[in-house]
UniProtKB/Swiss-Prot annotation:
Alphabetical list of Pfam families matching this protein: KOW (PF00467), ribosomal_L24 (PF17136)
Protein name, entry field: Large ribosomal subunit protein uL24m
InterPro entries: KOW, Rib_uL2_dom2, Ribosomal_uL24, Ribosomal_uL24_CS, Ribosomal_uL24_KOW, Translation_prot_SH3-like_sf
Domain KOW positions: 56-89
SUPFAM superfamilies linked to this entry: Translation proteins SH3-like domain (SSF50104)
Ranges where the record places region Disordered: 167-186
Keyword Mitochondrion: yes
Quaternary structure and partners: Component of the mitochondrial ribosome large subunit (39S) which comprises a 16S rRNA and about 50 distinct proteins.
CDD domains xrefs: KOW_RPL26
Superkingdom assignment: Eukaryota
GO biological process: ATP biosynthetic process; cellular respiration; translation
SMART domains: KOW (SM00739)
Annotated family: Belongs to the universal ribosomal protein uL24 family.
Amino acid sequence: MRLTALLSMAAKVALPHGYRYGTNRPWTIAARRLNPPGKRRRKVFVEPIANEDWPVVRGDTVEVLSGKEKGKQGKVAQVIRARNWVILEGLNTHYRYVGRSGDYRGTYLASEAPLLLKDIALIDPTDRKPTEIQWRYTEEGERVRVSVRTGRIIPKPVFQRKDGIVPQQWKDGPKDTSPEDTLQKTYTPSLKTLEEEVMEKMNIQENRRPRKSYWY
C-alpha cells in the first residue's frame, strides 16, 4: 500500500448533525454552500444498505430501468452510498451554463444527474441483459455476486483511482519511494539542535567561543 493511500485512509471529515449528502464531496466548496452553518434542512430518508451488501461498485456496467434513459446501458462513474445514488457516464444528463457573467453567457456543460439504486440493474455478462443478483460464496470462501437468472458470477471491475491508476497494476518508477523505504526508521531523536547534528555528521569542529556581551 502506498503512502498516499495510507494518508487518505487516516483522514476523516467530521460532519455536523443533520448534514445532507449530495453529489459533491463534503470538503468541497460546493458541498459547503449547500450545507451552510446554522441551516437546518429537511431530513431525507434513505433505505439502509450495509456496505458489504452493496450490489454496485464503480466501473460496473448497468442498465437503466426507468426514466428518460430507460433501456440504455452505461458504466458507473460514481457511487454515493449515503443517498443510494449511482451516477452513470453520459446518461441522465442535464445541461447548464457555468461561469456566467455580465457580458459572457458562460460555458455550456453537460452534467450527469444521479439515479436511485432501484432504478438500475447489473448486466449479466452471459447475455448482456439486466438481472437481479444474489450474494454467494465460492469454494475458496470468496463472496461473489451471482446472477439470479443464469447463475453466472458477475465479477467486480478492477479498482481504479480518480487519477486513473490501478493499484494492482502499478509499478514503481525511479522517482517513487517503495513502501519498505517509507516504513523504515531512519531518524533517531536526540537533544541536539539541527546545526549540531549537521556539524557532527559532517565532522565540523567548532573551536570558537563567543565573547562576553554586556547590556547597559
